[in-house]
């Protein structure tokens, strides 16, 4: 088994709408002495993808609904931000105190529909999740492949966990690789057949990448080298989102 390396790509400028992320990442990696190579997995923070795609809103332009105003007044929240959270949601899964757990239009269940104000680039601005993170990942991967680098791409975002404290990064978009590694049908060294074991390697890689990234360190991209990923150009992140009919808790 080859050793696994994880390193961050720094030196990226503030991302503006229309930015060509693949080109910028390739240049920053080369400038930092760590050029991308075939077989790499490139994990890109969703926030810079959203900025490049113009997925930001100015809260001053938002007219909150009566519910957003009432709920925000009760819990000391910004009604414009609450309205954005509601607009980005398919439904509210849990509303407990000042916390809104929502299901996004992508099918993700997370706090505040993934809407975030940190590192937004300006006061009073909020960053939304990409409209189609798989399409975003495919576009970045296509840019890498055009430059001669066959690398897989994961778009990551930070999610909380229902049963544990602390947050971790998970994959919300993928291109070029299978997101799940199945052991079903295989046999362990003692002869026991695996019946249900499936590893979400996309989430594991996203979480590992966060160890060298972070909101305050200005390292929005990480490269994982040495992971033997399974090629799949038709893969989508929807395959890791559990269908509601099989969800025991929603």
Predicted segment positions?
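Phosphate-interacting basic helix/loop segments used at nucleotide- and nucleic-acid interfaces
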Residues: 19-34, 131-151
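N-terminal, positively charged regions that mediate nucleic acid binding
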Residues: 1-65
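A structural signal for small-residue-enriched, beta-sheet-centric alpha/beta enzyme cores
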Residues: 2-12, 46, 56-62, 67-128, ...
């Amino acid at each position: 088994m080859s050793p696994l390396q994880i390193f961050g790509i720094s030196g990226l400028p503030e991302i503006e709408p229309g930015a060509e992320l693949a080109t910028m990442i390739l240049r920053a990696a080369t400038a930092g002495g760590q050029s991308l190579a075939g077989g790499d997995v490139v994990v890109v923070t969703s926030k810079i993808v959203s900025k490049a795609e113009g997925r930001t809103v100015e809260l001053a332009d938002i007219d909150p609904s009566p519910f957003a105003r009432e709920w925000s007044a009760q819990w000391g929240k910004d009604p414009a931000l609450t309205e954005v959270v509601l607009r980005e949601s398919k439904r509210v899964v849990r509303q407990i105190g000042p916390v809104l757990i929502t299901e996004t239009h992508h099918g993700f269940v997370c706090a505040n529909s993934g809407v975030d104000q940190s590192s937004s680039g300006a006061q009073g601005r909020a960053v939304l999740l990409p409209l189609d993170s798989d399409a975003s990942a495919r576009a970045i991967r296509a840019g890498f492949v055009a430059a001669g680098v066959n690398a897989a791409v994961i778009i990551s975002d930070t999610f909380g966990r229902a049963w544990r404290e602390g947050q971790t990064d998970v994959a919300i978009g993928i291109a070029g690789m299978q997101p799940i590694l199945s052991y079903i049908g295989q046999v362990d060294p003692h002869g026991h057949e695996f019946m249900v074991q499936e590893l979400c390697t996309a989430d594991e890689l996203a979480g590992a990448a966060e160890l060298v990234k972070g909101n305050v360190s200005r390292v929005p991209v990480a490269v994982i080298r040495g992971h033997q990923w399974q090629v799949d150009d038709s893969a989508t992140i929807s395959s890791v989102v559990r269908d509601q009919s099989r969800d025991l808790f929603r």
